[in-house]
Design a protein with these regions (language model features):
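Aromatic-residue-lined binding/catalytic grooves and analogous aromatic/hydrophobic interfacial grooves
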Residues: 158, 180-183, 190
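Single conserved hydrophobic/aromatic residue that forms the stacking wall/gate
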Residues: 191-202
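Metallocofactor- and cofactor-centric catalytic cores in central/energy metabolism, strongly enriched
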Residues: 1-79, 105-171, 187
Length: 202
C-alpha cells in the first residue's frame, strides 16, 4: 500500500494542500481496519490533524470528495507473482507495468477502474481521480477514453533517480537540475549536477 507514503506527503505539504478528511476504502474489511488504525496513529505521530475513517462503500466515501486517490491491485500480490514469473519463464520481461505482465495487469485493472470512475461521475463529478494503480499510463488512458472524469496518473518512482544521484554523488539537492520525461517504468531522466567543483551530466 502507498497509503503511508501518501499520508506523509499530505502532511509535509499541509500548508498548500489543507486536507480536512481522509476516507479509506477497501474490499477487504480486515485489511481496511488495520490500515485505518495505522493511519490514525501515523497522523498523531506526524502531528497532522485530519479526520480519518473507513468504509467499504464507494458511494459513502465519494459524496463530497475533492480527490480520489486510487491504488488498487486486482488479483492481489498472488496475481502479481504470476505476472512477473510467467513471462520470465519464456525469456521476456516479467514486470507489472510493461511487457506481457503489464498487459495482463492492465486487462484486470482497467474494468475495475472504469467502475470506480463511473461512481466518481455519479457521486462527485467535480473530483479529480489521482491514479497510482499500475500500469498507470494504460489504466489512466483507458479510463479517460471511456469516462467523463478529471484524472491524472502518477508514480512516486519519478523522483527516485534524483534522490539516488544526491546520495551517490554526495551533493546537495539545490545543486541538482532534474528533468523527467515519461511515466513509471517508461521514462528518461536527465540529471545535471551544477556544483562549481564538478559539473556532471547523467
Amino acid at each position: 500500500s502507498y497509503t503511508p507514503e501518501l499520508i506523509e506527503g499530505l502532511s509535509e505539504h499541509r500548508d498548500v494542500l489543507p486536507v480536512k478528511e481522509v476516507v479509506l476504502v477497501d474490499i477487504n474489511e480486515e485489511r481496511l481496519k488495520i490500515m485505518e488504525g495505522f493511519v490514525k496513529r501515523f497522523c498523531q505521530h506526524l502531528d497532522y490533524h485530519v479526520d480519518v475513517w473507513s468504509t467499504d462503500s464507494r458511494k459513502e466515501a465519494f459524496v463530497g470528495a475533492d480527490f480520489i486517490a486510487c491504488q488498487i491491485r486486482v488479483g492481489g500480490n498472488k496475481q502479481r507473482i504470476f505476472d512477473e514469473k510467467i513471462p520470465l519463464k519464456y525469456g521476456v520481461i516479467g514486470q507489472e507495468t510493461t511487457g506481457v505482465g503489464g498487459m495482463f495487469n492492465a486487462l484486470r485493472t482497467i474494468p475495475v477502474m472504469i467502475e470506480i470512475a463511473k461512481d466518481v461521475e455519479k457521486y462527485c463529478p467535480d473530483a479529480w481521480i489521482v491514479n497510482y494503480s499500475n500500469p498507470t499510463g494504460l489504466v489512466t488512458e483507458a479510463v479517460l477514453k471511456v469516462c467523463n472524469v478529471k484524472m491524472a496518473g502518477l508514480c512516486a518512482g519519478g523522483m527516485r533517480p534524483r534522490w539516488w544521484a544526491e546520495e551517490a554523488l554526495n551533493v546537495k539537492e539545490e545543486s541538482i537540475y532534474y528533468d523527467y520525461i515519461g511515466l513509471n517504468h517508461m521514462n528518461l531522466s536527465l540529471i545535471h549536477i551544477s556544483e562549481p567543483t564538478r559539473p556532471i551530466s547523467i
